[in-house]
Amino acid sequence: MAAKEVKFSTDARDRVLRGVDTLANAVKVTLGPKGRNVVIEKSFGAPRITKDGVTVAKEIELEDKFENMGAQMVREVASKTSDLAGDGTTTATVLAQAIVKEGAKSVAAGMNPMDLKRGIDLAVEAIVNDLKAHAKKVTTNEEIAQIATISANGDIEIGRFLADAMQKVGNDGVITVEEAKSLDTELEVVEGMQFDRGYASPYFVTNAEKMRVEFEDPYILIHEKKLSTLQSMLPLLEAVVQSGKPLLVVAEDVEGEALATLVVNRLRGGLKVAAVKAPGFGDRRKAMLEDIAILTGGQAISEDLGIKLENVTLKMLGRAKKVVIDKENTTIVNGAGSKKDIEARVTQIKMQIEETTSDYDREKLQERLAKLAGGVAVIRVGGATEVEVKERKDRVDDAMHATRAAVEEGILPGGGVALLRGLKALDAIKTVNADQKAGVDIVRRAIQVPARQIVQNAGEDGSLVVGKLLENSSYNWGFNAASGEYQDLAKAGVIDPAKVVRTALQDAASVAALLITTEALIAEKPKKSEPAPAAPPMDF
């Protein structure tokens, strides 16, 4: 086992603080509408230019192991905030730095670190309650566009695209962001449920020009097992023929005699039919077939449930307004399932998303949720160069998460003002002793820092502007750093999602309080590398 180096008390906290400062100072220049860019060297390809706090934080690795510990702890704040809220990473980093700095001073003055932590926790709880009380629900498309624009650093085009995407696929719909091959940014929306399985045979095609199957108002048979013979299905097929409606068969596989019989019937014109394989594999396939059944108001025919194919009636089949099948995908539009059943299924999937620990499972569950809840939107981000496209794609990702967060918990005035207004909530806190009161005061000073930093990045005097803001008691009144004016920020469209502000504060306080209460640091001793032996003389 390698030898370890140990640092204690003041020495330990000083090293941590240096690391925190190095990382936070690099990140905080990006804060606000007039924040600057950070250029990151890449081991291959062009350098990356970004204004995304978490991207900058993830690139920082310090040589001194003890300083690096401090930097990594604050990097954790940015990552956690990014995971939970998708934005607010720079605000969280700035808050963490402020709390650690103020806390280190208090500990150096001889205060009890544990009481300071309790005071910090009380203050954070009071501000979070204040933020929740003042959060305003998002209702209009314009508000969504404003939030997306701000989170994309003032890019109005991105804001408009995101608002359109959310309007079309709903709040639970999946929005994916890709790099475009052209200069223009474009939006493509797939309505209804789409899964990646095409027709089992090209003979099913009804639109020869586009090589796809198009059915209006079809019946949908959802079968869990393979279909290799149609003997047991004949009564059902006769009933479908009499109804005059088309039939879509979704099964694990349709092969041999069954496929041949369906193709022959299709070509003779007696039966409008198409067959596709069921999406997914294993347990996920069962779940997706159940999703299709709920969406279309049908029943998944499964031997587990004791339903045999010969007993299936038309009432057990799903219905949809339209089905489109091409070589690779099947899209079911306007399924006839009851809204209540679909909502119950959506709630069930949401609970599974919360409980799962696997990122892969979470992603697949979110895809299923989106397919049930309304559709999938793809935003293709364009730009003149690869560097520009990557930078814009980062901003679209941020904006998308911020917009979702706003719809979830509502909005607050931006520009760091919501945190400033939380100062009043701190006055009502009752503390047990002077050290806890000092903990509350640490947060009192820290929550002024984001607003000050935004103003400084815009080239104004931070302390002067914050002083002016505190003189005015109107909740939404603040400094618009983009225009350099004092105004009602909510009316001006300078808004932040409540979830982003709340998460940034809670994550920052959580990690900063741990750093304040740190008394020892342990790291591996750097290995002394032996000098390389001298090369032999050339005439050897």
Swiss-Prot record:
Pfam families on file: Cpn60_TCP1 (PF00118)
Residues bound to ATP: 30-33, 51, 87-91, 415, 480-482, 496
One GO term describing the cellular component: GroEL-GroES complex
Induction: By heat shock.
Catalytic reactions of this protein: ATP + H2O + a folded polypeptide = ADP + phosphate + an unfolded polypeptide
UniProt subcellular location: Cytoplasm
Gene3D superfamilies listed in its UniProt record: GroEL, GroEL-like equatorial domain, TCP-1-like chaperonin intermediate domain
An example molecular function term from Gene Ontology annotations: isomerase activity
Domain of life per record: Bacteria
EC number: 5.6.1.7
Cross-referenced InterPro entries: Chaperonin_Cpn60_CS (IPR018370), Cpn60/GroEL (IPR001844), Cpn60/GroEL/TCP-1 (IPR002423), GroEL-like_apical_dom_sf (IPR027409), GROEL-like_equatorial_sf (IPR027413), TCP-1-like_intermed_sf (IPR027410)
Disulfide linkage: none
Keywords annotated in UniProt: ATP-binding, Chaperone, Cytoplasm, Isomerase, Nucleotide-binding, Stress response
Entry keyword annotation includes Transmembrane: no
SUPFAM superfamilies, alphabetized: GroEL apical domain-like (SSF52029), GroEL equatorial domain-like (SSF48592), GroEL-intermediate domain like (SSF54849)
GO biological process annotation, one example: chaperone cofactor-dependent protein refolding
Quaternary state and interactors: Forms a cylinder of 14 subunits composed of two heptameric rings stacked back-to-back. Interacts with the co-chaperonin GroES.
Alphabetical list of HAMAP family matching this protein: CH60
Function description: Together with its co-chaperonin GroES, plays an essential role in assisting protein folding. The GroEL-GroES system forms a nano-cage that allows encapsulation of the non-native substrate proteins and provides a physical environment optimized to promote and accelerate protein folding.
Matches recorded under NCBIfam families: GroEL, PRK00013.1, PRK12849.1, PRK12850.1, PRK12851.1
Family: Belongs to the chaperonin (HSP60) family.
Protein name: Chaperonin GroEL 1
Organism in which the protein naturally occurs: Bradyrhizobium diazoefficiens (strain JCM 10833 / BCRC 13528 / IAM 13628 / NBRC 14792 / USDA 110)
